Amino acid sequence: MSKNLLTFEDVSVNFTQEEWQWLSDTQRDLYRKVTLENYKSLVSLGIPVYKPAVISLLEQGKDPWMVQKKGARDTCPDWQYVFKGTEFISKQDIYKESAKVLTMGRSHFSSSLDCPDLKEDHENEDWFKNRLGRQEVHSHQLFITHKEVPESEIRGCNPSCQAVHQNAILDVPQCSSTKERIDQSEPQKRSYRKKSVEMKHKKVQVEKRILKCSECEKVFNQTSSLTLHQRIHTGEKPYACVECGKAFSQSANLAQHKRIHTGEKPYECKECRKAFSQNAHLAQHQRVHTGEKPYQCKECKKAFSQIAHLTQHQRIHTGERPFECIECGKAFSNGSFLAQHQRIHTGEKPYVCHVCGKAFSHRGYLIVHQRIHTGERPYECKECRKSFSQYAHLSQHQRVHTGEKPYECKVCRKAFSQVAYLDQHQRVHTGEKPYECAECRKAFSNSSSLAQHQRSHTGEKPYICKECRKTFSQNAGLAQHQRIHTGEKPYECNICGKAFSYSGSLTLHQRIHTGERPYECKDCRKSFRQRAHLAHHEKVHTMESFLSLSSPSPSMSSQLPRTLGLIS
Protein backbone atom coordinates (compact mmCIF):
# COMPACT_ATOMS: atom_id res chain seq x y z
CA MET A 1 0.00 0.00 0.00
CA SER A 2 1.37 3.47 -0.79
CA LYS A 3 2.35 5.72 2.05
CA ASN A 4 -0.03 8.30 0.67
CA LEU A 5 -3.00 5.89 1.16
CA LEU A 6 -2.39 5.30 4.86
CA THR A 7 -5.73 5.39 6.73
CA PHE A 8 -6.81 5.44 10.35
CA GLU A 9 -8.03 1.85 10.02
CA ASP A 10 -4.47 0.82 9.18
CA VAL A 11 -3.25 1.90 12.61
CA SER A 12 -6.31 1.17 14.77
CA VAL A 13 -7.62 -1.77 16.83
CA ASN A 14 -11.28 -2.35 17.76
CA PHE A 15 -12.60 -4.10 20.87
CA THR A 16 -15.94 -5.70 21.75
CA GLN A 17 -17.58 -4.97 25.08
CA GLU A 18 -16.37 -8.24 26.58
CA GLU A 19 -12.84 -7.66 25.35
CA TRP A 20 -12.86 -4.22 26.88
CA GLN A 21 -13.95 -5.65 30.26
CA TRP A 22 -10.86 -7.86 30.31
CA LEU A 23 -8.49 -4.88 30.23
CA SER A 24 -7.12 -3.30 33.37
CA ASP A 25 -7.34 0.46 33.95
CA THR A 26 -3.68 0.84 32.96
CA GLN A 27 -4.24 -1.07 29.73
CA ARG A 28 -7.32 1.00 28.91
CA ASP A 29 -5.38 4.24 29.49
CA LEU A 30 -2.63 2.96 27.21
CA TYR A 31 -5.16 2.14 24.51
CA ARG A 32 -6.73 5.61 24.74
CA LYS A 33 -3.34 7.32 24.60
CA VAL A 34 -1.97 5.36 21.64
CA THR A 35 -5.19 5.56 19.61
CA LEU A 36 -5.45 9.34 20.04
CA GLU A 37 -1.75 9.73 19.21
CA ASN A 38 -2.18 7.71 16.03
CA TYR A 39 -5.08 9.89 14.94
CA LYS A 40 -3.20 13.12 15.68
CA SER A 41 -0.13 11.85 13.82
CA LEU A 42 -2.17 11.20 10.67
CA VAL A 43 -3.72 14.67 10.87
CA SER A 44 -0.32 16.35 11.41
CA LEU A 45 1.09 14.55 8.35
CA GLY A 46 -1.55 16.19 6.20
CA ILE A 47 -3.34 12.92 5.46
CA PRO A 48 -7.10 13.47 4.92
CA VAL A 49 -8.74 11.55 7.76
CA TYR A 50 -12.41 11.48 8.71
CA LYS A 51 -13.06 11.52 12.43
CA PRO A 52 -13.88 7.93 13.43
CA ALA A 53 -16.52 7.16 16.03
CA VAL A 54 -13.92 5.64 18.34
CA ILE A 55 -12.06 8.97 18.50
CA SER A 56 -15.24 10.83 19.41
CA LEU A 57 -15.92 8.29 22.18
CA LEU A 58 -12.39 8.58 23.55
CA GLU A 59 -12.49 12.39 23.50
CA GLN A 60 -15.77 12.28 25.46
CA GLY A 61 -14.25 9.88 28.01
CA LYS A 62 -16.58 7.04 27.03
CA ASP A 63 -15.71 3.37 26.57
CA PRO A 64 -14.70 2.70 22.94
CA TRP A 65 -15.85 -0.91 22.62
CA MET A 66 -17.75 -1.89 19.45
CA VAL A 67 -21.19 -3.55 19.54
CA GLN A 68 -21.17 -7.09 18.10
CA LYS A 69 -23.72 -7.34 15.28
CA LYS A 70 -26.40 -10.01 15.48
CA GLY A 71 -26.35 -12.78 12.93
CA ALA A 72 -22.61 -13.05 12.96
CA ARG A 73 -20.90 -16.40 12.91
CA ASP A 74 -21.32 -18.62 15.91
CA THR A 75 -17.96 -17.72 17.33
CA CYS A 76 -16.84 -16.25 20.56
CA PRO A 77 -17.10 -12.46 20.12
CA ASP A 78 -14.24 -12.05 22.56
CA TRP A 79 -11.85 -13.36 19.90
CA GLN A 80 -12.98 -11.20 17.02
CA TYR A 81 -9.62 -9.87 15.89
CA VAL A 82 -8.28 -7.56 13.23
CA PHE A 83 -4.92 -8.82 12.02
CA LYS A 84 -2.67 -6.28 10.31
CA GLY A 85 0.03 -7.72 8.06
CA THR A 86 3.19 -5.70 7.43
CA GLU A 87 4.25 -7.48 4.25
CA PHE A 88 2.71 -9.33 1.27
CA ILE A 89 2.53 -12.59 3.21
CA SER A 90 1.78 -16.15 2.14
CA LYS A 91 -1.27 -18.12 3.27
CA GLN A 92 0.92 -20.34 5.38
CA ASP A 93 2.26 -17.27 7.21
CA ILE A 94 -1.31 -16.07 7.70
CA TYR A 95 -2.25 -19.32 9.39
CA LYS A 96 0.83 -19.18 11.57
CA GLU A 97 -0.14 -15.71 12.78
CA SER A 98 -3.76 -16.83 13.20
CA ALA A 99 -2.61 -19.77 15.27
CA LYS A 100 -0.70 -17.45 17.56
CA VAL A 101 -3.79 -15.35 18.18
CA LEU A 102 -6.24 -18.22 18.55
CA THR A 103 -4.10 -20.32 20.82
CA MET A 104 -3.64 -17.56 23.36
CA GLY A 105 -7.29 -17.88 24.41
CA ARG A 106 -7.12 -21.53 25.27
CA SER A 107 -7.17 -22.94 28.77
CA HIS A 108 -4.36 -25.33 27.81
CA PHE A 109 -2.17 -22.32 26.91
CA SER A 110 1.09 -24.09 27.58
CA SER A 111 0.45 -26.77 24.97
CA SER A 112 0.85 -24.26 22.16
CA LEU A 113 4.50 -23.81 23.04
CA ASP A 114 5.23 -27.07 21.26
CA CYS A 115 5.05 -25.14 18.00
CA PRO A 116 8.40 -23.36 17.42
CA ASP A 117 6.62 -20.68 15.45
CA LEU A 118 4.57 -19.78 18.52
CA LYS A 119 7.29 -19.83 21.14
CA GLU A 120 8.65 -16.51 19.95
CA ASP A 121 5.29 -14.86 20.47
CA HIS A 122 5.06 -16.03 24.09
CA GLU A 123 8.62 -15.01 24.78
CA ASN A 124 7.95 -11.54 23.43
CA GLU A 125 6.10 -8.82 25.27
CA ASP A 126 2.40 -8.16 25.82
CA TRP A 127 0.05 -9.35 23.04
CA PHE A 128 -2.42 -6.58 23.75
CA LYS A 129 0.20 -3.87 23.37
CA ASN A 130 1.42 -5.65 20.26
CA ARG A 131 -2.05 -5.14 18.81
CA LEU A 132 -1.94 -1.44 19.64
CA GLY A 133 1.61 -1.12 18.42
CA ARG A 134 1.10 -2.43 14.86
CA GLN A 135 1.36 0.90 13.11
CA GLU A 136 3.42 0.14 10.05
CA VAL A 137 2.12 0.88 6.55
CA HIS A 138 0.14 -2.31 5.91
CA SER A 139 -0.23 -4.23 2.69
CA HIS A 140 -2.87 -6.75 3.89
CA GLN A 141 -5.83 -6.46 6.21
CA LEU A 142 -7.24 -9.80 7.36
CA PHE A 143 -10.32 -10.32 9.52
CA ILE A 144 -9.91 -13.65 11.29
CA THR A 145 -12.17 -15.58 13.68
CA HIS A 146 -11.81 -19.07 15.10
CA LYS A 147 -13.64 -20.76 12.22
CA GLU A 148 -12.15 -18.80 9.31
CA VAL A 149 -9.18 -21.13 8.86
CA PRO A 150 -10.21 -23.95 6.51
CA GLU A 151 -9.12 -27.34 7.75
CA SER A 152 -7.83 -28.22 4.29
CA GLU A 153 -5.36 -25.33 4.44
CA ILE A 154 -4.00 -26.30 7.84
CA ARG A 155 -2.46 -29.42 6.31
CA GLY A 156 0.32 -27.22 4.91
CA CYS A 157 1.64 -26.52 8.42
CA ASN A 158 3.98 -28.73 10.39
CA PRO A 159 2.30 -31.27 12.75
CA SER A 160 2.69 -29.23 15.91
CA CYS A 161 1.17 -26.20 14.21
CA GLN A 162 -1.69 -28.33 12.85
CA ALA A 163 -2.48 -29.46 16.38
CA VAL A 164 -2.63 -25.91 17.53
CA HIS A 165 -5.01 -24.95 14.74
CA GLN A 166 -7.21 -27.99 15.31
CA ASN A 167 -7.40 -27.38 19.02
CA ALA A 168 -8.15 -23.73 18.45
CA ILE A 169 -11.05 -24.52 16.16
CA LEU A 170 -12.50 -27.39 18.20
CA ASP A 171 -12.32 -25.53 21.47
CA VAL A 172 -14.25 -22.48 20.30
CA PRO A 173 -17.57 -23.43 21.94
CA GLN A 174 -15.82 -23.63 25.31
CA CYS A 175 -15.50 -19.84 25.26
CA SER A 176 -19.20 -19.45 26.04
CA SER A 177 -18.63 -20.46 29.61
CA THR A 178 -18.04 -17.51 31.88
CA LYS A 179 -15.80 -19.53 34.20
CA GLU A 180 -13.68 -20.81 31.33
CA ARG A 181 -13.45 -17.33 29.87
CA ILE A 182 -12.09 -16.01 33.16
CA ASP A 183 -9.65 -18.93 33.36
CA GLN A 184 -8.55 -18.35 29.80
CA SER A 185 -7.96 -14.65 30.43
CA GLU A 186 -5.27 -15.29 33.04
CA PRO A 187 -2.50 -16.22 30.56
CA GLN A 188 -3.44 -13.19 28.47
CA LYS A 189 -3.34 -10.87 31.46
CA ARG A 190 0.12 -12.15 32.29
CA SER A 191 1.15 -11.68 28.66
CA TYR A 192 -0.38 -8.19 28.47
CA ARG A 193 2.36 -6.79 30.71
CA LYS A 194 5.20 -7.48 28.28
CA LYS A 195 4.89 -5.61 24.99
CA SER A 196 4.64 -1.87 25.68
CA VAL A 197 8.26 -1.37 24.66
CA GLU A 198 7.68 -3.19 21.35
CA MET A 199 4.52 -1.16 20.70
CA LYS A 200 6.28 2.17 21.24
CA HIS A 201 9.26 1.02 19.17
CA LYS A 202 7.03 0.15 16.23
CA LYS A 203 5.24 3.50 16.51
CA VAL A 204 8.57 5.32 16.23
CA GLN A 205 9.52 3.10 13.28
CA VAL A 206 6.38 4.17 11.41
CA GLU A 207 7.03 7.86 11.96
CA LYS A 208 10.67 7.48 10.92
CA ARG A 209 9.74 5.54 7.83
CA ILE A 210 7.30 8.23 6.76
CA LEU A 211 9.61 11.20 7.58
CA LYS A 212 12.87 9.93 6.10
CA CYS A 213 14.91 11.70 3.39
CA SER A 214 15.17 9.45 0.35
CA GLU A 215 18.58 10.95 -0.54
CA CYS A 216 20.55 10.64 2.70
CA GLU A 217 18.22 8.60 4.96
CA LYS A 218 18.10 11.40 7.54
CA VAL A 219 15.00 11.23 9.75
CA PHE A 220 12.80 14.16 10.83
CA ASN A 221 9.99 14.67 13.33
CA GLN A 222 7.94 16.99 11.10
CA THR A 223 7.14 17.08 7.41
CA SER A 224 8.05 20.77 7.27
CA SER A 225 11.56 19.96 8.51
CA LEU A 226 11.91 17.25 5.88
CA THR A 227 10.75 19.63 3.14
CA LEU A 228 13.32 22.23 4.16
CA HIS A 229 16.06 19.60 4.33
CA GLN A 230 15.32 18.24 0.85
CA ARG A 231 16.10 21.67 -0.63
CA ILE A 232 19.75 20.98 0.24
CA HIS A 233 19.69 18.15 -2.31
CA THR A 234 17.51 19.88 -4.91
CA GLY A 235 19.12 23.31 -4.57
CA GLU A 236 15.66 24.88 -4.53
CA LYS A 237 15.56 28.47 -3.22
CA PRO A 238 11.95 29.63 -3.49
CA TYR A 239 12.29 32.75 -1.32
CA ALA A 240 13.79 35.70 -3.27
CA CYS A 241 14.61 39.20 -2.03
CA VAL A 242 12.67 41.82 -4.00
CA GLU A 243 15.45 44.37 -3.38
CA CYS A 244 18.52 42.55 -4.70
CA GLY A 245 17.13 39.28 -6.09
CA LYS A 246 19.13 37.05 -3.74
CA ALA A 247 17.31 33.74 -3.11
CA PHE A 248 17.05 31.56 -0.02
CA SER A 249 15.83 28.06 0.79
CA GLN A 250 14.02 29.17 3.96
CA SER A 251 11.73 32.10 4.63
CA ALA A 252 13.49 32.76 7.96
CA ASN A 253 16.79 33.32 6.13
CA LEU A 254 15.08 35.76 3.77
CA ALA A 255 13.62 37.66 6.73
CA GLN A 256 17.11 38.00 8.23
CA HIS A 257 18.55 39.12 4.89
CA LYS A 258 15.91 41.84 4.43
CA ARG A 259 17.24 43.56 7.53
CA ILE A 260 20.38 44.46 5.53
CA HIS A 261 18.19 46.64 3.32
CA THR A 262 15.87 47.96 6.03
CA GLY A 263 18.56 48.45 8.65
CA GLU A 264 16.30 46.83 11.24
CA LYS A 265 18.11 45.56 14.33
CA PRO A 266 15.54 44.13 16.74
CA TYR A 267 17.96 42.37 19.10
CA GLU A 268 19.59 44.74 21.60
CA CYS A 269 22.37 44.11 24.11
CA LYS A 270 21.25 45.03 27.64
CA GLU A 271 24.81 45.92 28.62
CA CYS A 272 25.81 48.44 25.94
CA ARG A 273 22.53 48.92 24.02
CA LYS A 274 24.18 47.77 20.80
CA ALA A 275 21.62 46.30 18.40
CA PHE A 276 21.83 43.36 15.99
CA SER A 277 19.79 42.04 13.10
CA GLN A 278 20.04 38.42 14.25
CA ASN A 279 19.65 36.83 17.68
CA ALA A 280 22.71 34.63 17.03
CA HIS A 281 24.84 37.74 16.52
CA LEU A 282 23.60 39.14 19.83
CA ALA A 283 24.54 35.90 21.60
CA GLN A 284 28.04 36.09 20.11
CA HIS A 285 28.38 39.77 21.06
CA GLN A 286 27.40 39.16 24.68
CA ARG A 287 30.56 37.11 25.09
CA VAL A 288 32.47 40.41 24.73
CA HIS A 289 30.97 41.44 28.08
CA THR A 290 31.20 38.05 29.77
CA GLY A 291 34.66 37.27 28.42
CA GLU A 292 33.53 33.76 27.62
CA LYS A 293 35.72 31.95 25.09
CA PRO A 294 34.49 28.36 24.94
CA TYR A 295 36.29 27.32 21.75
CA GLN A 296 40.00 26.50 22.18
CA CYS A 297 42.64 25.63 19.59
CA LYS A 298 44.30 22.29 20.36
CA GLU A 299 47.55 23.40 18.71
CA CYS A 300 48.31 26.67 20.51
CA LYS A 301 45.59 26.71 23.20
CA LYS A 302 44.26 30.05 21.96
CA ALA A 303 40.58 30.46 22.83
CA PHE A 304 37.77 32.06 20.85
CA SER A 305 34.26 33.27 21.57
CA GLN A 306 32.90 31.89 18.28
CA ILE A 307 33.42 28.48 16.70
CA ALA A 308 33.73 30.10 13.27
CA HIS A 309 36.73 32.09 14.51
CA LEU A 310 38.33 28.89 15.80
CA THR A 311 37.79 27.18 12.44
CA GLN A 312 39.40 30.11 10.63
CA HIS A 313 42.28 30.23 13.10
CA GLN A 314 43.06 26.53 12.70
CA ARG A 315 43.79 27.16 9.03
CA ILE A 316 46.85 29.13 10.16
CA HIS A 317 48.28 25.84 11.43
CA THR A 318 47.10 23.74 8.51
CA GLY A 319 47.75 26.33 5.79
CA GLU A 320 44.41 25.42 4.28
CA ARG A 321 42.84 27.93 1.87
CA PRO A 322 39.74 26.22 0.53
CA PHE A 323 38.03 29.27 -0.95
CA GLU A 324 39.37 30.15 -4.41
CA CYS A 325 38.40 33.01 -6.69
CA ILE A 326 37.29 31.68 -10.09
CA GLU A 327 38.34 34.97 -11.73
CA CYS A 328 41.98 35.24 -10.67
CA GLY A 329 42.65 32.00 -8.78
CA LYS A 330 43.50 33.71 -5.50
CA ALA A 331 42.71 31.51 -2.49
CA PHE A 332 41.42 32.47 0.94
CA SER A 333 41.12 30.82 4.33
CA ASN A 334 37.45 31.72 4.81
CA GLY A 335 34.43 32.37 2.63
CA SER A 336 33.83 35.93 3.79
CA PHE A 337 37.27 37.01 2.56
CA LEU A 338 36.52 35.45 -0.83
CA ALA A 339 33.12 37.16 -1.02
CA GLN A 340 34.73 40.52 -0.24
CA HIS A 341 37.49 39.90 -2.78
CA GLN A 342 35.06 39.00 -5.55
CA ARG A 343 33.49 42.45 -5.29
CA ILE A 344 36.74 43.80 -6.75
CA HIS A 345 35.85 41.97 -9.96
CA THR A 346 32.11 42.67 -9.89
CA GLY A 347 32.27 46.22 -8.54
CA GLU A 348 29.36 45.37 -6.26
CA LYS A 349 28.80 47.68 -3.29
CA PRO A 350 25.76 46.30 -1.45
CA TYR A 351 26.20 48.24 1.80
CA VAL A 352 24.69 51.72 1.50
CA CYS A 353 24.82 54.52 4.07
CA HIS A 354 21.25 55.70 4.78
CA VAL A 355 22.49 59.19 5.70
CA CYS A 356 24.57 60.19 2.68
CA GLY A 357 23.91 57.33 0.23
CA LYS A 358 27.56 56.31 -0.06
CA ALA A 359 28.00 52.62 -0.91
CA PHE A 360 30.66 50.16 0.25
CA SER A 361 31.82 46.70 -0.77
CA HIS A 362 32.33 45.55 2.82
CA ARG A 363 29.96 45.81 5.75
CA GLY A 364 32.87 46.75 8.02
CA TYR A 365 33.64 49.77 5.86
CA LEU A 366 30.04 50.94 6.19
CA ILE A 367 30.13 50.60 9.98
CA VAL A 368 33.31 52.67 10.17
CA HIS A 369 31.88 55.24 7.76
CA GLN A 370 28.68 55.66 9.77
CA ARG A 371 30.75 56.83 12.73
CA ILE A 372 31.49 59.96 10.71
CA HIS A 373 27.81 60.87 10.97
CA THR A 374 27.25 59.67 14.52
CA GLY A 375 30.55 60.95 15.89
CA GLU A 376 31.03 57.64 17.69
CA ARG A 377 34.60 56.94 18.84
CA PRO A 378 34.48 53.69 20.81
CA TYR A 379 38.25 53.09 21.04
CA GLU A 380 40.00 55.18 23.72
CA CYS A 381 43.70 55.56 24.49
CA LYS A 382 44.42 54.77 28.15
CA GLU A 383 47.39 57.14 28.17
CA CYS A 384 45.82 60.40 26.97
CA ARG A 385 42.09 59.46 26.83
CA LYS A 386 41.97 60.30 23.13
CA SER A 387 39.33 58.28 21.32
CA PHE A 388 39.14 56.86 17.81
CA SER A 389 36.49 55.54 15.47
CA GLN A 390 38.61 52.55 14.44
CA TYR A 391 40.69 50.11 16.48
CA ALA A 392 43.48 50.28 13.89
CA HIS A 393 43.73 54.03 14.44
CA LEU A 394 44.06 53.49 18.19
CA SER A 395 46.86 50.98 17.63
CA GLN A 396 48.66 53.44 15.38
CA HIS A 397 48.17 56.28 17.87
CA GLN A 398 49.61 54.29 20.76
CA ARG A 399 52.95 54.30 18.95
CA VAL A 400 53.07 58.04 19.63
CA HIS A 401 53.43 57.21 23.32
CA THR A 402 55.74 54.24 22.86
CA GLY A 403 57.83 55.87 20.12
CA GLU A 404 57.72 52.65 18.16
CA LYS A 405 58.47 53.00 14.43
CA PRO A 406 58.68 49.48 13.06
CA TYR A 407 58.47 50.34 9.35
CA GLU A 408 61.75 51.55 7.80
CA CYS A 409 62.50 52.82 4.30
CA LYS A 410 65.28 50.77 2.66
CA VAL A 411 66.41 53.72 0.54
CA CYS A 412 66.89 56.47 3.13
CA ARG A 413 66.47 54.46 6.37
CA LYS A 414 63.64 56.73 7.54
CA ALA A 415 61.29 54.92 9.92
CA PHE A 416 57.52 55.18 10.29
CA SER A 417 54.95 54.13 12.84
CA GLN A 418 52.50 52.95 10.17
CA VAL A 419 53.03 50.80 7.10
CA ALA A 420 50.75 53.12 5.12
CA TYR A 421 53.10 56.02 5.84
CA LEU A 422 56.03 53.95 4.60
CA ASP A 423 54.17 53.07 1.39
CA GLN A 424 53.37 56.72 0.77
CA HIS A 425 56.94 57.77 1.54
CA GLN A 426 58.46 55.26 -0.86
CA ARG A 427 56.57 56.94 -3.69
CA VAL A 428 58.79 59.99 -3.07
CA HIS A 429 61.69 57.87 -4.30
CA THR A 430 59.81 56.12 -7.09
CA GLY A 431 57.71 59.11 -8.21
CA GLU A 432 54.70 56.81 -8.47
CA LYS A 433 51.26 58.44 -8.44
CA PRO A 434 48.79 55.60 -8.96
CA TYR A 435 45.63 57.44 -7.90
CA GLU A 436 44.19 59.62 -10.68
CA CYS A 437 41.17 61.91 -10.58
CA ALA A 438 38.62 60.93 -13.21
CA GLU A 439 37.45 64.55 -13.52
CA CYS A 440 40.68 66.45 -14.12
CA ARG A 441 43.21 63.60 -14.55
CA LYS A 442 45.33 64.92 -11.67
CA ALA A 443 47.33 62.12 -10.05
CA PHE A 444 48.18 61.49 -6.41
CA SER A 445 50.56 59.24 -4.52
CA ASN A 446 47.93 58.04 -2.03
CA SER A 447 44.21 57.33 -2.09
CA SER A 448 43.34 59.65 0.78
CA SER A 449 44.75 62.61 -1.12
CA LEU A 450 42.66 61.65 -4.14
CA ALA A 451 39.54 61.30 -1.98
CA GLN A 452 40.12 64.73 -0.48
CA HIS A 453 40.76 66.22 -3.92
CA GLN A 454 37.58 64.76 -5.38
CA ARG A 455 35.56 66.72 -2.85
CA SER A 456 36.70 69.88 -4.61
CA HIS A 457 34.67 68.69 -7.60
CA THR A 458 31.68 67.36 -5.68
CA GLY A 459 31.60 70.06 -3.02
CA GLU A 460 31.06 67.35 -0.43
CA LYS A 461 31.81 68.33 3.16
CA PRO A 462 30.89 65.33 5.30
CA TYR A 463 32.60 66.49 8.51
CA ILE A 464 30.37 68.75 10.63
CA CYS A 465 31.33 70.70 13.74
CA LYS A 466 28.76 70.00 16.46
CA GLU A 467 29.36 73.39 18.06
CA CYS A 468 28.83 75.76 15.13
CA ARG A 469 27.62 73.36 12.38
CA LYS A 470 30.49 74.41 10.11
CA THR A 471 31.37 71.71 7.57
CA PHE A 472 34.70 70.50 6.25
CA SER A 473 35.85 68.30 3.41
CA GLN A 474 38.56 66.69 5.53
CA ASN A 475 38.50 65.21 9.00
CA ALA A 476 41.82 66.90 9.78
CA GLY A 477 40.25 70.26 8.98
CA LEU A 478 37.43 69.55 11.41
CA ALA A 479 39.86 68.43 14.12
CA GLN A 480 41.86 71.64 13.77
CA HIS A 481 38.72 73.78 13.75
CA GLN A 482 37.37 72.20 16.94
CA ARG A 483 40.40 73.51 18.82
CA ILE A 484 38.95 76.99 18.38
CA HIS A 485 36.06 75.91 20.61
CA THR A 486 38.10 73.85 23.05
CA GLY A 487 41.12 76.18 23.24
CA GLU A 488 43.37 73.16 22.97
CA LYS A 489 46.98 73.85 21.93
CA PRO A 490 48.72 70.47 21.78
CA TYR A 491 51.81 71.58 19.84
CA GLU A 492 54.46 73.17 22.09
CA CYS A 493 57.83 74.66 21.19
CA ASN A 494 60.70 72.83 22.90
CA ILE A 495 62.80 76.00 23.07
CA CYS A 496 60.50 78.72 24.38
CA GLY A 497 57.47 76.72 25.51
CA LYS A 498 55.00 78.56 23.30
CA ALA A 499 52.02 76.38 22.32
CA PHE A 500 50.01 76.22 19.12
CA SER A 501 46.75 74.66 18.02
CA TYR A 502 48.14 73.54 14.64
CA SER A 503 51.29 71.58 13.89
CA GLY A 504 51.94 73.85 10.90
CA SER A 505 52.00 76.90 13.17
CA LEU A 506 54.60 75.23 15.39
CA THR A 507 56.76 74.39 12.36
CA LEU A 508 56.72 78.02 11.20
CA HIS A 509 57.49 79.27 14.72
CA GLN A 510 60.49 76.96 15.14
CA ARG A 511 62.13 78.57 12.10
CA ILE A 512 62.51 81.73 14.19
CA HIS A 513 64.84 79.79 16.52
CA THR A 514 66.61 77.83 13.79
CA GLY A 515 66.86 80.70 11.30
CA GLU A 516 65.69 78.38 8.55
CA ARG A 517 64.35 80.13 5.43
CA PRO A 518 63.48 77.37 2.98
CA TYR A 519 61.60 79.49 0.42
CA GLU A 520 63.96 81.42 -1.92
CA CYS A 521 63.16 83.96 -4.61
CA LYS A 522 64.54 82.92 -8.00
CA ASP A 523 64.97 86.53 -9.13
CA CYS A 524 66.90 88.07 -6.24
CA ARG A 525 67.86 84.98 -4.21
CA LYS A 526 66.18 86.40 -1.11
CA SER A 527 64.78 83.68 1.23
CA PHE A 528 61.70 83.53 3.49
CA ARG A 529 60.39 81.43 6.39
CA GLN A 530 56.90 81.01 4.89
CA ARG A 531 55.68 80.20 1.40
CA ALA A 532 53.04 82.94 1.68
CA HIS A 533 55.76 85.54 2.27
CA LEU A 534 57.64 84.37 -0.82
CA ALA A 535 54.47 84.61 -2.92
CA HIS A 536 53.90 88.16 -1.68
CA HIS A 537 57.51 89.07 -2.41
CA GLU A 538 57.36 87.74 -5.97
CA LYS A 539 54.63 90.26 -6.71
CA VAL A 540 57.25 93.01 -6.20
CA HIS A 541 59.29 91.71 -9.11
CA THR A 542 56.16 91.47 -11.17
CA MET A 543 55.44 95.11 -10.33
CA GLU A 544 59.01 96.15 -11.25
CA SER A 545 58.74 94.50 -14.61
CA PHE A 546 55.49 96.29 -15.26
CA LEU A 547 56.92 99.69 -14.19
CA SER A 548 60.05 99.29 -16.31
CA LEU A 549 57.89 98.82 -19.35
CA SER A 550 55.80 101.90 -18.54
CA SER A 551 58.75 104.23 -17.44
CA PRO A 552 57.73 104.74 -13.80
CA SER A 553 58.16 108.08 -12.04
CA PRO A 554 61.01 108.56 -9.52
CA SER A 555 58.53 108.89 -6.65
CA MET A 556 57.04 105.42 -7.29
CA SER A 557 60.50 103.86 -7.69
CA SER A 558 61.56 105.27 -4.34
CA GLN A 559 58.70 103.43 -2.62
CA LEU A 560 59.73 99.97 -3.87
CA PRO A 561 62.65 99.45 -1.44
CA ARG A 562 60.39 100.42 1.46
CA THR A 563 57.87 97.74 0.35
CA LEU A 564 60.60 95.12 0.09
CA GLY A 565 61.76 95.91 3.60
CA LEU A 566 58.38 95.03 5.05
CA ILE A 567 58.60 91.41 3.85
CA SER A 568 61.75 90.06 5.46
From Swiss-Prot:
It is found in: Nucleus. Residues 6-77 form the KRAB domain. One of its GO terms (cellular component) is nucleus. Keywords: DNA-binding, Metal-binding, Nucleus, Repeat, Transcription, Transcription regulation, Zinc, Zinc-finger. A zinc finger (C2H2-type) spans 211-233, 239-261, 267-289, 295-317, 323-345, 351-373, 379-401, 407-429, 435-457, 463-485, 491-513, 519-541. Coiled coil: none annotated. GO terms for biological process: regulation of DNA-templated transcription. GO terms for molecular function: DNA binding; zinc ion binding. It holds the Pfam family zf-C2H2. It comes from the Eukaryota. May be involved in transcriptional regulation. This is Zinc finger protein 583. It comes from Mus musculus (Mouse). The lineage of its organism: Eukaryota, Metazoa, Chordata, Craniata, Vertebrata. The gene is Znf583.
